Regions:
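Gram-negative bacterial Sec-dependent N-terminal signal peptides
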Residues: 1-23
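Alpha-helical transmembrane segments and their juxtamembrane interfaces
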Residues: 14-15, 47, 337, 451
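N-terminal, active-site-proximal structural segment of metallo-dependent hydrolase catalytic domains
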Residues: 20-184, 213-244, 253, 257-266, ...
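Metal-dependent phosphoester-hydrolase catalytic domains
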Residues: 187-210, 214-219, 244-245, 254-255, ...
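Residues that define the transmembrane beta-barrel architecture of outer-membrane proteins
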Residues: 247-249
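Active-site His/acidic residue clusters
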Residues: 266-287
């Protein structure tokens, strides 16, 4: 009950109207930003688009049949019903947290971010309908982001002698162009003219970065590729010259927030770095994750080496207000990633350290209990901050990182314990505690005080 009351109280306080006239713009005294890895990584984009296009009535009919007369359904229909339940549960989570702007990670698209079928379908057929007595929620502004996942490279990047152009031969791991993409929903206007994307920024152009080298042939069960040895460059010179830094994309999306003092612009800095696991003999995913995290540390430091997809150069302008958000796939204390890089970002002089590692960092009661119940990865149960974990891996992977010139009212991880409302969204006896019920990640949110 506490979780419901605290979220409701804060969400009610998030906005104040400047007048009773419906034509009068809303003035915000507070704003909630969030990130959520939705686990909508379907086998094809078309599958997800079809699920999102299903009307509310069609969803209900299928789910009722699945629960009451499953023998009348084919196996494919049963699988679809389970996925529809998952989507509805994800929508309910969003309706409970009620962000003003948030990242939707692992929301597949067409690769270019041009097809809005799935994005609009999720909004209109799920978020727009009450889920389990929660209030519907709407977002006027949506950003479908182009991605490098599954994007053909034309090279044998994994050195297995084949050029498949998908999975490990794609610029970012994906079974097709658009898998594991991300999107942004916002109730605030997106300043489209000043959006910056860095999909094509080259890894080689980050100062200090070099072609990866084979460090240990024993890192892979199959050893080093034929004709290669420790110390050799992993990527061909031609591939390295074209290698994008971002496994998906790095985007700077300015949001315009009306406040009593005038319009406030907050840069929503979003990415979803490669997970630092499934490494080859050059430790490629570890290094890729590290470099993708370093990107933001340098960007908010206004370093000059950046160029975006439109040719504009330079990092974020000094003094800008920002929120870095997304599934960063890195934990500063445990896990397989470069802990120093994520720790450096969390403790940057340009971020609100109290909100990243201090008393205002997002926490939950469900995190510690997740280990006790055996729902989270046991090997990480000795983490120093179980209340801050954001996934069933038992790691803190998902972040909302505000700039040092932003004030924070509150924050949290939507990870209810068994004694709190919403627990059915993180554990179900039939669906489990991971992607079956909602996701293997938990939604992280943070409330900004816009009066200061």
């Amino acid at each position: 009950m506490f979780l419901k009351k605290s979220l409701l109280a804060v969400s009610i306080a998030l906005t104040t109207l400047s007048g009773c006239n419906s034509n009068t713009p809303t003035e915000y005294s507070a704003a909630r930003f969030a990130t959520y890895n939705l686990s909508f990584d379907r086998a094809t984009y078309e599958i997800l688009a079809d699920e999102m296009s299903m009307s509310h009535t069609e969803q209900s009919n299928l789910i009722n049949m699945f629960k009451q007369s499953p023998e009348r359904l084919t196996e494919d229909q049963k699988s679809t019903a389970k996925r529809i339940i998952q989507i509805r549960n994800v929508a309910e989570t969003i309706q409970r947290v009620r962000p003003n702007a948030f990242v939707l990670a692992e929301f597949n698209n067409d690769g270019e971010g041009k097809d809005m079928t799935a994005i609009n379908g999720f909004h209109d057929n799920y978020l727009a309908y009450s889920q389990n007595d929660q209030r519907p929620i709407s977002f006027t502004f949506k950003k479908n982001v182009a991605t490098n996942t599954g994007r053909a490279s034309g090279f044998d990047l994994d050195r297995d002698g084949k050029k498949t152009d998908i999975k490990n031969d794609a610029w970012g791991f994906g079974g097709y162009h658009g898998q594991y993409a991300f999107a942004i929903f916002s109730q605030f206007e997106i300043d489209e003219k000043n959006v910056r994307t860095f999909q094509n920024f080259k890894w080689k152009d980050m100062p200090g970065e070099e072609n990866l080298k084979i460090i240990d042939c024993k890192l892979s069960k199959s050893g080093c590729p034929t004709g290669m040895k420790e110390g050799d460059n992993w990527y061909s010179d031609e591939a390295w010259q074209q290698m994008p830094l971002s496994s998906k994309n790095h985007v700077d999306v300015p949001l315009i927030i009306p406040t009593k003092a005038g319009n406030e612009v907050i840069h929503f800095l979003v990415s979803h770095p490669a997970p630092p696991i499934f490494n080859n003999v050059a430790n490629h995913n570890y290094e890729h994750n590290r470099a993708e995290l370093k990107f933001w540390d340098d960007y908010i430091n206004a370093k000059s080496y950046f160029y975006d997809d439109n040719g504009k150069t330079g990092g974020l302008a000094a003094g800008s207000k920002f929120i870095i958000a997304g599934d960063m796939n890195a934990d500063a204390m445990k896990g397989d990633g470069d802990r120093l890089t994520i720790d450096k970002l969390l403790k940057s002089p340009y971020v609100n350290i109290n909100a990243t590692v201090g008393g205002k960092k997002p926490t939950s009661k469900g995190g510690p209990e997740c280990f006790d119940l055996g729902h989270c990865k046991a090997e990480n149960s000795n983490t120093l901050y179980p209340e801050a974990i954001t996934s069933v891996s038992g790691l803190r992977l998902d972040y909302v990182i505000p700039s040092s010139n932003l004030s924070i009212n509150n924050s949290g991880v939507f990870f209810p314990s068994s004694r709190e409302e919403g627990y059915h969204l993180v554990f179900d006896k039939e669906l489990g505690a991971s992607k079956g019920v909602t996701s293997d990640h938990r939604m992280v949110w943070m409330d900004l005080d816009l009066t200061k």
